[in-house]
């Protein structure tokens, strides 16, 4: 008997152990991402050819404790390597695991390589050569918790590569993951009509057809790891392959199961057909181009097993939520008697089906953790958490309280915004605590920002509420789902003020009291314009005429633009970020503002204040609540440091000058007593700077007018 380890993705262990048991393997023991087993050589060949779930099978040659580099070398040296492969073959070592004396995998691989080469030399042979890319004989080594396992890669290249896939779609599904979906759904145990309405390149259907037609998944592979192993029994292997070929030929002819696949992308459907033809099962599968929402059940009962689009794969989140909701509605109404199995990484999306799951499992699509849910659709199937919606009822009724509130807000604020001369404003700000989001309208786009929920609320609850918000929004405010952008916001905790999201850009031009500003709705957590400072910016513009204006922590320079348009004698704009300084320059150009009187400075604002010896008539500063950027000499906390900051700023203020100080710290407390002793006059001006669209949540808005006493 030989000892083996069958590796597989996390979450496959139970299914793989069951498969190995059915093959006849013994001493089966589940481990992390794989299963140990023993088998005679002939059975090991059969498992390698027929396993639908394993990614790799290795023959364990040595396993023992290892506490030093010397022990590692000795463990590898004691193996009779010339009995396993010829020095005319190339070899490689794939080393996994670190800890203790092994700081990196390269060190471990090098020690084993040295031992192998030395063993060949000491046995009187020339040393074999190492090949890093395409070795004949591959050694697998794993070091964990002081134990070293040295093995031979018995199966060769990853077993999920069956050989039938020509190219992939945008979001390919690995073949062994598709097989595990079929196993865990219960379909493999009782094959029946199978439908995949998001078939992509056809992987789920092809794997199912291979099962139903008794075709070995490894039959089309042209390379295995044991081929250069000196103990390889070629005759036994050829007999097993010949038997598999005979079974496949007979299985296709006898298969009576019907398979149906569709996808909205004609290119993918054509690819699926090519893959099915390569796999020898095209005659068993009916493919067509179709929208999943338009498909009809091809039989009275069957299985619908699919891997629909989700956030990490394809598409806009709000559009996908609508899709999932509509799918759930279609399943409920038209697929009574069917079983549904669905793979999805987003709790929000899968909860939008509004169907009660019989079983919920976890699977990994690569490194991505996914939910794999099973549903039984009865003739009178009901939705979970919501009443069954009669025909014609608005989808916003999923979250009626939220939908009604935001609909009312949007209607009131639209008239106000037109009157004010603005086209970007907030229409909802956690008005209802259960729906803990902010919703901002930017022209004909909407950004939904999810606030971090209290730790006491289960994640599943917050995810479901968020999905309900995104489902209800389009109908409630009359917006296309593809113009809804989702972001997650947390209260600032020791990080920098601005957070970059990705490289994508969705740029718009917004208008505010006659000023124009460039927005980037997707590149950063913030868009380039703080909407709650709208009236503060206008106030700066109203006070700027003929004055020398300084804007610190300027962000994208929007207050500077208002000052310049207001007739400022000069405007100095300072920010630490070169990105935002350039953005500020773009905003000036957008408004036709140019000239030497407009200065842009990229600098650490706190250091710049200390170094500055100029005087200004109007200063606007909106510092971060907290910042510890590597580019700043010191950390900054607005509550802790505001007295010192304002004390330094009034030294730059002309005798009749004014300083507008703003921040967004919750429960900020101005130290008026200390500032008064410093001959600094302080007046809160929240009442004239808090916009109407933010009056529902005034706690984060602090604005002060400061002058010399």
From Swiss-Prot:
SUPFAM superfamilies xref list: S-adenosyl-L-methionine-dependent methyltransferases (SSF53335)
GO molecular function: 23S rRNA (guanine(2445)-N(2))-methyltransferase activity; RNA binding; rRNA (guanine-N7-)-methyltransferase activity
Keywords: Cytoplasm, Methyltransferase, RNA-binding, rRNA processing, S-adenosyl-L-methionine, Transferase
Organism superkingdom: Bacteria
Stretches assigned to the THUMP domain: 43-154
Methyltransferase recorded as keyword: yes
Main enzyme class: transferase
Annotated compartments: Cytoplasm
GO CC, any one term: cytoplasm
Catalysed transformations (reactions): guanosine(2445) in 23S rRNA + S-adenosyl-L-methionine = N(2)-methylguanosine(2445) in 23S rRNA + S-adenosyl-L-homocysteine + H(+); guanosine(2069) in 23S rRNA + S-adenosyl-L-methionine = N(2)-methylguanosine(2069) in 23S rRNA + S-adenosyl-L-homocysteine + H(+)
EC number: 2.1.1.173, 2.1.1.264
Recorded family membership: Belongs to the methyltransferase superfamily. RlmKL family.
Function: Specifically methylates the guanine in position 2445 (m2G2445) and the guanine in position 2069 (m7G2069) of 23S rRNA.
Protein name according to UniProt: Ribosomal RNA large subunit methyltransferase K/L
Species of provenance: Shewanella putrefaciens (strain CN-32 / ATCC BAA-453)
């Amino acid at each position: 008997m030989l000892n083996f380890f069958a590796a597989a993705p996390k979450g496959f262990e139970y299914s793989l152990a069951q498969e190995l048991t059915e093959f006849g393997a013994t001493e089966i023991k589940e481990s992390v991402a794989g299963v140990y087993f023993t088998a005679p050589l002939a059975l090991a060949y059969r498992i390698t050819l027929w396993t639908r779930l394993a990614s790799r099978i290795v023959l364990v040659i040595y396993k023992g404790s290892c506490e030093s580099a010397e022990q590692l070398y000795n463990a590898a040296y004691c193996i009779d390597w010339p009995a396993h492969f010829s020095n005319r073959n190339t070899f490689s070592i794939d080393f996994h695991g670190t800890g203790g004396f092994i700081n990196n995998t390269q060190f471990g691989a090098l020690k084993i390589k040295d031992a192998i080469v030395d063993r060949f030399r000491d046995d009187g042979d020339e040393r074999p050569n190492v090949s890093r890319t395409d070795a004949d004989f591959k050694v697998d080594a794993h070091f964990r918790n002081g134990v070293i396992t040295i093995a031979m890669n018995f199966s060769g290249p990853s077993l999920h590569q069956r050989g039938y896939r020509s190219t992939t779609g945008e979001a390919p599904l690995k073949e062994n993951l598709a097989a595990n979906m079929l196993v865990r759904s219960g379909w493999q145990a009782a094959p029946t009509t199978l439908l995949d309405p998001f078939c992509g390149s056809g992987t789920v259907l092809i794997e199912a057809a291979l099962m139903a037609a008794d075709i070995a998944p490894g039959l089309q592979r042209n390379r295995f790891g044991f081929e250069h192993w000196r103990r390889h029994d070629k005759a036994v292997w050829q007999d097993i392959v010949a038997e598999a070929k005979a079974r496949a030929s007979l299985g296709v002819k006898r298969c009576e199961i019907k398979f149906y696949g569709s996808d909205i992308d004609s290119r993918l459907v054509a690819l699926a057909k090519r893959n099915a033809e390569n796999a020898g099962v095209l005659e068993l599968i009916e493919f067509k181009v179709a929208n999943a929402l338009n498909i009809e059940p091809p039989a009275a009962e069957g299985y619908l097993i699919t891997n629909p689009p989700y956030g990490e794969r394809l598409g806009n989140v709000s559009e996908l939520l609508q899709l999932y909701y509509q799918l759930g509605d279609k399943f409920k109404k038209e697929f009574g008697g069917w079983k549904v199995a669905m793979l999805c990484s987003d709790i929000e999306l899968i909860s939008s089906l509004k169907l009660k799951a019989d079983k919920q499992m976890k699977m990994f699509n690569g490194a991505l953790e996914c939910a794999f849910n099973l549903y039984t659709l009865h003739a009178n199937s009901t939705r979970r958490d919501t009443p069954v919606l009669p025909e014609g009822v608005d989808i916003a009724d999923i979250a009626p309280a939220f939908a009604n509130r935001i609909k009312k807000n949007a209607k009131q604020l639209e008239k106000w915004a037109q009157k004010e001369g603005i086209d970007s404003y907030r229409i909802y700000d956690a008005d209802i605590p259960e729906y803990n989001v902010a919703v901002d309208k930017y022209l004909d786009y909407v950004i939904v920002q999810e606030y971090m929920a209290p730790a006491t609320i289960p994640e599943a609850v917050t995810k479901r509420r968020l999905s309900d918000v995104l489902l209800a929004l389009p109908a409630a405010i009359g917006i296309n789902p593809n113009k809804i952008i989702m972001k997650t916001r947390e209260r600032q905790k020791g990080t920098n003020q601005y957070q970059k999201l990705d490289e994508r850009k969705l740029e718009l031009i917004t208008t505010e009291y006659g000023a124009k500003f460039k927005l980037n709705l997707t590149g950063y957590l913030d868009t380039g314009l703080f909407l709650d400072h709208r009236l503060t910016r206008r106030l700066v513009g109203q006070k700027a005429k003929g004055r020398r204006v300084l804007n610190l922590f300027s962000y994208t320079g929007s207050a500077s633009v208002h000052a310049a348009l207001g007739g400022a004698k000069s405007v100095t704009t300072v920010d630490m970020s070169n990105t935002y300084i350039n953005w500020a320059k773009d905003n000036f150009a957008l408004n036709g503002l140019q000239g030497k009187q407009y200065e842009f400075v990229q600098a650490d604002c706190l250091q710049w204040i200390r170094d500055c010896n100029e005087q200004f008539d109007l200063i606007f500063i909106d510092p971060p609540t907290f910042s510890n950027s590597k580019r700043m000499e010191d950390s900054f906390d607005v509550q802790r440091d505001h007295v010192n900051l304002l004390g330094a700023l009034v030294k730059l203020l002309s005798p009749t000058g004014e300083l507008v100080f703003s921040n967004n710290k919750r429960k900020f407390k101005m130290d008026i007593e200390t500032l008064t002793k410093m001959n600094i006059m302080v007046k809160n001006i929240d009442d004239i700077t808090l916009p109407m669209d933010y009056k529902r949540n005034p706690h984060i808005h602090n604005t002060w007018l400061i002058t010399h006493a």
